[in-house]
C-alpha cells in the first residue's frame, strides 16, 4: 500500500504543518474504504523498480534517462507493469526510452498556461484534481519547492507513485487522495491550480470559495475550465450528458466566469487564453483502452458534441486572493 508517512514528515516543519491535525486520520479512513482494485494497483507499484536517472528533465517534458540503458528484459517488465495501470489519461511521459503516450497531450495545456504564471520558483503549490500528476512534475520543473496534488481517484494515485519510482523517488511532488471539499482551509499556498474541475461541480461558487480558502493573501489562482461563447449571463446547463460525460453541470461564458470569481472575492481577474480542444490534444492511443474526443463529437460536424452542444472549448483565468 502507499505510505504517506514520508509526506507527514516532510510537512511537519513547513507551513503545511497544520494539515497534520486532520490529514492522517482522513487517510486512515480513506484506506479502509478503498476500491477493490486498489490493492492490485498498489502491488503493481511495488513491483516496479526504483530507478535513479542520470538525466532528468522536468522543465521541458517529464523525461528520465540514464547513461547505461535498460536491458530489453528490464524495459519489457516496466512496460508490462505500466500497462496494467491503464488507462493513462494525462501525459506524456518519457521514461528510460519508454514512451507512455497518454490520451491527453497535457504538455499542450502547460504551454498555454505557463507564460502567464507568476514564477513558481520556491513556491508551495496545490494542484486540485491533479489526475496522475503530469502537471505537478512540470511545476517541479519550474522550481516549485513543494507541490501537493489532490485527487480522490485511486488509479491516479497509483499511476503517480509508479512514475515517482522512475523519477528518482522525487519527493518534491506528492499526491493526496482527497477532494478539495475534504481539505481543511489552510490558507498557505502561493499558487492554487484547478484545471478541468469546475464543470464537474454541482456548486461552482462553492468550489471557487474552497480554492480561495487554500490560498495565502495575494496568492495566485489558475483556473482552467470549459467555457461557451456568450455574455455575462450565459451558462450552459446540459440536460443530460455533455460529450458523453454525465457529470458536467455548469459551463459558463468567460464573462460569466469572471463575474463568479469577483463574487467569490478574487481580484485582478483576467482571461489569458481560450482554446478549442483539438483531436491532436485529446485522442486514442495504445495506452488508452477507451473512447476519446473523436467519439464525443458529432461525426458530421466537429464543432458540436454528439449531443448537439458546442464542442469543448477551454479558457484559462488567473486571479489573486
UniProtKB/Swiss-Prot annotation:
| Catalytic activity, reaction form | carboxy-S-adenosyl-L-methionine + 5-hydroxyuridine(34) in tRNA = 5-carboxymethoxyuridine(34) in tRNA + S-adenosyl-L-homocysteine + H(+)
Residues that, per the record, bind carboxy-S-adenosyl-L-methionine: 90, 104, 109, 129, 151-153, 180-181, 195, 199, 314
Q: Which Pfam families match?
A: Methyltransf_9
Q: Which UniProt keywords apply?
A: Transferase, tRNA processing
Q: InterPro entries from the xrefs?
A: CmoB, Mo5U34_MeTrfas-like, SAM-dependent_MTases_sf
* PANTHER family given in the database record: METHYLTRANSFERASE, TRNA U34 CARBOXYMETHYLTRANSFERASE
Protein name, UniProt field: tRNA U34 carboxymethyltransferase
Q: Which organism is it from?
A: Actinobacillus succinogenes (strain ATCC 55618 / DSM 22257 / CCUG 43843 / 130Z)
What gene makes this protein?
cmoB
